[in-house]
Amino acid sequence: MSSITLPAKANEHPQVRTLNILRDLSPVADLIELCFSPTMDQDGQRYLSDMRRASHDDKFLSWANHMAESTSLPLTGYVWEENNKIVGNASLIPFRDQGKRIYLIANVATHPDHRRRGIGRILTQRAMEHARSKKATAIWLHVRDDNPGAIKLYADLGFQEIARRTNWQANPDLSFPKPATDIEINLRHPRFWAQQLDWLRRLYPDNLSWYQPLNINALKPGLINWLYRLFMDFNIKQWAAVSKRDGENLLATLTWMPQGGRTEAIYAATRSLVLPKESRDDVSGAEALTQLLIHVRRALANHPTLSLDYPAGEMTDAILAAGFKPRRTLIWMRA
């Protein structure tokens, strides 16, 4: 894919400067809220609250000033400032992937009164230059699929789409109706581990493992892993959907692995993911996923909102049938 080289030297764009966490966190939070509040969820609101709270925490600011390049927090980046007001931002978040440095560009925002001037483009390129100067092996970003302007901008800068994933959410509900079915839901048996592992690796691929919180190894059955989860207070629940006629016929699995926060993550894997494209929504796999999602909504009735990350366009009807609603679809792009 072609890449457009844009001038981004400090003397050509004097409005651009590096993020100063000692004074910029609150105005950047205000800018992000202004630009993204219509699509912001509770986690996003909490993120902004944390930024504003951190901006008044001297101990945190002192620590963060020395850790900006080694922590997965948005403590590095570039802003566009005019008349002592921040009107543009691009954050840089460092990650490690198998020992290699990568960066996620996030929070690319331009004040509505200053758009169509190329500010977002220039800030994104400056962020890319920073990442390359740090010997990053990859630069990532994600963008909503309903933002064609931003998608084109990033494509013009050399980013290519790697994945497209939808986040689904539903509140636990003990009263949610459970339809009659020939599918049985049980705790996941160790004999299903090999099949579950294969499905999970296909559904949660390695190229996004640096960002996804799923620790697949923690799901492995056995005494050692059980002791690890016990001593680390690592709470996990796993279920399997099988045919009542043949209990050895695994149809789907579902894992609940809360990470803290206002939503709790669940991870689904179904047989359909390994079938040809034209057969992916097979009846048994789709019905099994629906039954598992209904089961977890009923079983975790006193828990926070459940959140499912799933490939966009896959099993849509099955997930909707369980009462989940799509929150957003993100396109993951890499340069």
Q: What are the roles of these predicted feature ranges?
A:
Residues 121, 145-163, 311-328:
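Conserved active-site alpha-helix within GNAT-family acetyltransferase domains
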Residues 75-79, 85-94, 104, 109, ...:
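Conserved beta-strand in the GNAT
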